[in-house]
Amino acid sequence: MRTPKHDLPEAVAKRIPIYYRYFKLLETDGIERIKSEQLAKLVAIPSATIRRDFSYIGDLGRSGYGYEVSHLIQIFSAVLKADILTKMAVIGVGNLGRALIENNFRRNDNLQITCAFDTNPALVGQTLNGVPIYAIDQLATVIPAAGITTAISTVPSEASQRSAEQLIDAGITSILNFAPTRLQVPRHINVRYLDLTAELQTLLLFEE
């Protein structure tokens, strides 16, 4: 599995999009500068952690002065490649896949689902929210032609490994997998897992 760019530890890499989102909100509110202690309250992350996270990227602020919002937006935008459009494919147009396509990252200008794939003949050939739905066996031709390297897999666990193999054969190098099954993939393939059931069970552990 690939490591994040800029030699960022995985925990830090997961927090960078959070920082970026909040700096964008600060910019919208007309705030030009913020200190780490103030930012810590907004993002619910300790200020010491924020300063340590930022140190992995560079000297982003000055002691006693804080962080310039516009400068941090530029830095995080470059790290996240926020100025580059990333086209994605969705594999599996069930309830979850359909919801993702309907939303299609409407709050992010640089993320866009441009095609979807399913095994259901009744869905193949249809268009959902402007996104065409293809048959799974069309992966090998559609993905390379569209220049897509990122896919979101919403297929059931029993189909996730086979789906991943087909995606990789088609040129996909990054996969967001909603099935809990750990995929066996080459080292250069980047896989992230999002198990909604596990997240909810973890949440309930803290319920009084």
Swiss-Prot record:
The keyword Repressor applies. Homodimer. It holds the Pfam family CoA_binding. Belongs to the transcriptional regulatory Rex family. HAMAP family: Rex. GO terms for molecular function: DNA binding; DNA-binding transcription factor activity. It comes from the Bacteria. This is Redox-sensing transcriptional repressor Rex. PANTHER family: REDOX-SENSING TRANSCRIPTIONAL REPRESSOR REX (PTHR35786), REDOX-SENSING TRANSCRIPTIONAL REPRESSOR REX 1 (PTHR35786:SF1). It is found in: Cytoplasm. Keywords: Cytoplasm, DNA-binding, NAD, Repressor, Transcription, Transcription regulation. It comes from Latilactobacillus sakei subsp. sakei (strain 23K) (Lactobacillus sakei subsp. sakei). The lineage of its organism: Bacteria, Bacillati, Bacillota, Bacilli, Lactobacillales. NAD(+) binds at G92, V93, G94, N95, L96, G97. Residues 18-57 bind DNA. Its main location: cytoplasm. One of its GO terms (biological process) is negative regulation of DNA-templated transcription. One of its GO terms (cellular component) is cytoplasm. Coiled coil: none annotated. Modulates transcription in response to changes in cellular NADH/NAD(+) redox state.
